[in-house]
Amino acid sequence: MGIIVLKNEGLNFHARISTPLSEIDDDIQKELLDLTKKVKVAGFRAGKVPVSIVKKKYGTSVRHDIIEKRINNLVNHIIKEYNLNIIGRPKIEELQNEPDKDLEFTVKIELLPKITIPDLKKISLDRPKLAVNSQDVEIQLEKLAALTKCYTKESKTKIKDGDQVTIDAIGYIKDRAFDGGKLNDFKVVIGSNTLIQGFEQQLIGSKTGNEVDVNVTFPENYHDKNLSGKDAHFVVQIKAVHTAEPTIIDEEFAKKFQSNSLEELRTHFAKQIENESEEAINTIMKMNLFDKLEKLLDFDVPESLLEQEKNILKSETDKNKHDGSLLNGKSSKEITEYYNKLALRRVRIGLLLAEYAKFKNLQLEPDDFKKIIMQQARNFPGQENMIFDFYKNNPRAIEGLKGPALEDKTVQYIFNNEIQLKEKRYTKEELEKYLETEEQRISLI
């Protein structure tokens, strides 16, 4: 075997490899002899087929298999001999495999960079913490009370905000009734915004037995494209009006919601309010950590990974164009620079986290997959069971979660064991503003 190293610098290793024709022919001959004992050919006893017959019938495919096997063995030998930390599949070029010449080819191998893990203990980050106050809790209790109102008291007075109204209605567009525009014995709480914007407000001041003309415009993004953006006229019959008995928030109220006391229900809501912001906080904390890491990392990255990441970015941008892409109005040069910078950031951080996970021997457990599937399910409200069933019935889809699951586990390990976290307390209103600002920022990265 002959090896001529053509390039061994940065993350690229190129070599020209050759192996004598005699060795190839020996391997082919040996394989053909083995086949004479296995193949069945009409007119010959089993195991007695002449090698010339076998060669005529199988020679081409045997040679192809031997060449492929020899190339793989030679490439693996090169990788081991030069201790190459490769990424992806080696590329075989300029292959010379004529039957009367030595086997020669050029192999091009892309390498992973040597990564030095920075001192993560020097990183310091603020961690937002929601300071839940009694007013936040009382607002949630009042919302719960509003949802559980009993509309039992019939009212003969004029309709006001908060009343429950039972109606019949027929909708018209240009004086023609349209499909889906008819309501019978429909109950709506005024101010709940259950119906099209402006509909409920036009019932205020009417009484049971009145006929009311309601004029509305369907929103442009209405689910029925035949109605979106169109003006409509509804003829509404007021059949009944009910007011709710006042809901008293007391110990008995709390017991309706599996709480032993009102204080226990308040504690439950305080914890719920805290938890509602946790996922958003964790996402922002992760991006803030990545911002710090980006400044510490300067190693070269494999070109193939960079191109792959740029293609993902382009695909994401194309998918979200209708949302008003940040690249709208940018020159092709600016767009290229954006893709290059962001792809480099993502690849560097991804490689560092993979190296760190390997160094710390972090392994995925079943609970890690459950956690990330739960995160996926939360993105599809009302379809959670469908998401769970999908992953349960598609083991290969679970494989696709390994990368994100290990990244999340590694980031959490770094938060728990490496960097310095300083708690910064926010009121609910302050935290909502902070999260909104940060979510807009990280949407760009």
From Swiss-Prot:
GO terms for molecular function: peptidyl-prolyl cis-trans isomerase activity; protein folding chaperone; ribosome binding. GO terms for biological process: 'de novo' cotranslational protein folding; cell division; chaperone-mediated protein folding; protein transport; protein unfolding. The keyword Cell cycle applies. It is found in: Cytoplasm. InterPro entries: PPIase_dom_sf, PPIase_FKBP_dom, Trig_fac, Trigger_fac_C, Trigger_fac_C_sf, Trigger_fac_ribosome-bd_bac, Trigger_fac_ribosome-bd_sf, Trigger_fact/SurA_dom_sf. One of its GO terms (cellular component) is cytoplasm. NCBIfam families: tig. This is Trigger factor. It comes from Rickettsia prowazekii (strain Madrid E).
